[in-house]
């Protein structure tokens, strides 16, 4: 039997948290335990497990691949096996391509495709932003913060959720903090992208607090 330290380093066991690296999922499919949805209208989202040799955890990632420039749609991949109020939620994001946006984000306290919180990192506009999506409309919780998000490279996006306080980190550096009381109840967590962004995700981590 492998010692506990090795199990932790391989991502096979994590103390009091959930770590998903997609490496045991089936290529070309949505991973088990995840569902696909979308805010607004446009071409259907296309999420699937894909091979990427640059992945932080080799060899697979979860990718959003459909392209619908100008539709202002927000494809979502929701992890259905958790519902929580407070947590640290993080993911590694690789913004591969996009003419209008190169963007990826995490969502929390997700109720349905029209109601959730969202933090995003934009490699085209080089900023980080946080929103409340309510009744299908994005409500900006503060002005986006300029921050260098390297395109076609892996960046860590994390949100620390404690009651009404939300802190957003990029590559372990805190970038912004806001307070909002609209959605106080527990909800699901997941991944988000927008419009024509081709975005890869890996090493999704959720630690309840």
Regions found by a protein language model. Give the residues of each.
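Ligand-recognition surfaces built from glycine- and aromatic
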Residues: 16-21, 183-209
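Short tryptophan-centered beta-strand motifs in secreted/extracellular beta-sheet-rich domains
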Residues: 22, 89-91, 152-168
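Short, aromatic/His-centered strand-loop micro-motif at the edge of beta-sheets
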Residues: 134-156
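Secretory/extracellular carbohydrate-interaction modules
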Residues: 27, 59, 64-134
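Extracellular glycan-recognition surfaces and repeat-rich motifs
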Residues: 29-63, 70
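Extracellular carbohydrate-recognition regions
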Residues: 10-40, 202
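Short, solvent-exposed beta-strand-to-loop segments that form ligand-recognition rims
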Residues: 169-190
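Beta-strand-rich interaction surfaces with strong enrichment in secreted/lumenal proteins
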Residues: 75-82, 143-149, 190
């Amino acid at each position: 039997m492998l010692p506990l330290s090795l199990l932790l380093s391989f991502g096979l066991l994590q103390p009091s948290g959930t770590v998903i690296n997609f490496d045991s999922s089936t290529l070309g499919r949505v991973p088990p335990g995840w569902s696909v949805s979308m805010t607004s209208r446009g071409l259907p989202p296309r999420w699937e497990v894909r091979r990427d040799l640059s992945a932080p955890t080799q060899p697979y990632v979860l990718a959003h691949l459909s392209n619908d420039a100008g539709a202002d749609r927000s494809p979502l991949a929701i992890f259905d096996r958790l519902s929580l109020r407070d947590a640290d939620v993080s993911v590694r994001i690789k913004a591969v391509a996009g003419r209008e946006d190169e963007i990826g984000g995490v969502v929390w306290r997700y109720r349905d495709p029209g109601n959730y919180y969202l933090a995003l990192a934009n490699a085209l506009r080089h900023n980080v932003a946080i929103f409340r999506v309510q009744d299908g409309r994005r409500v900006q919780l503060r002005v986006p913060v300029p921050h260098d998000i390297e395109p076609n490279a892996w960046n860590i996006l994390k949100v620390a959720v404690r009651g009404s306080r939300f802190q957003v980190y990029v590559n372990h550096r805190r970038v912004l903090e806001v307070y909002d009381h609209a959605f106080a109840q527990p909800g699901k967590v997941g991944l988000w992208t927008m419009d024509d962004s081709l975005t890869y995700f890996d090493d999704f981590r959720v630690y309840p607090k």
